[in-house]
């Protein structure tokens, strides 16, 4: 989760995917130091999504926090469906995640792969 600005606590619940400053923060932290480990062995597909503000994990406004996480997950899910349809070509998949993305990845795995055999 790179949407962490304290001035946005309880005001902005989800990131704007066109926020250049936030995207650069994500690219030069999470993507550079974590996702790049796969560069030599796999095609990395790391789409932008409207990540929930870190405040969503701690807020007493559980309805808004849940809605923010749900919006983020729906973006991840849509990106995954798009990846499968346009880019995967029936190749094996590695789903790696960190922080908030791990919650979304776990849900994605359950929804798409659990009890599918």
Question: Which sequence ranges carry the predicted segments?
Answer:
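Active-site catalytic motif of lipid deacylating hydrolases and related acyltransferases
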Residues: 2-92
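Short glycine-enriched nucleophile-adjacent loop
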Residues: 104-113
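Gly/Ala-rich beta-loop-alpha elbow adjacent to hydrolase catalytic centers
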Residues: 97-101, 105
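Structured, solvent-exposed acidic/aromatic patches
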Residues: 92-94, 110
């Amino acid at each position: 989760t790179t949407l962490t600005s304290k001035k946005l606590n309880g005001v902005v619940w989800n990131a704007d995917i066109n926020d250049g400053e936030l995207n650069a923060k994500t690219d030069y932290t999470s993507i550079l130091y974590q996702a790049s480990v796969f560069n030599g062995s796999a095609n990395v597909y790391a789409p932008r999504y409207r990540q929930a503000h870190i405040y969503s994990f701690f807020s007493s406004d559980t309805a808004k926090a849940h809605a923010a996480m749900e919006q983020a997950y729906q973006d991840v899910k849509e990106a995954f469906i798009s990846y499968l349809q346009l880019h995967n070509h029936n190749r094996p998949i590695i789903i790696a995640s960190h922080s908030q993305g791990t919650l979304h990845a776990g849900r994605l795995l359950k929804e798409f792969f659990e009890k599918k055999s």
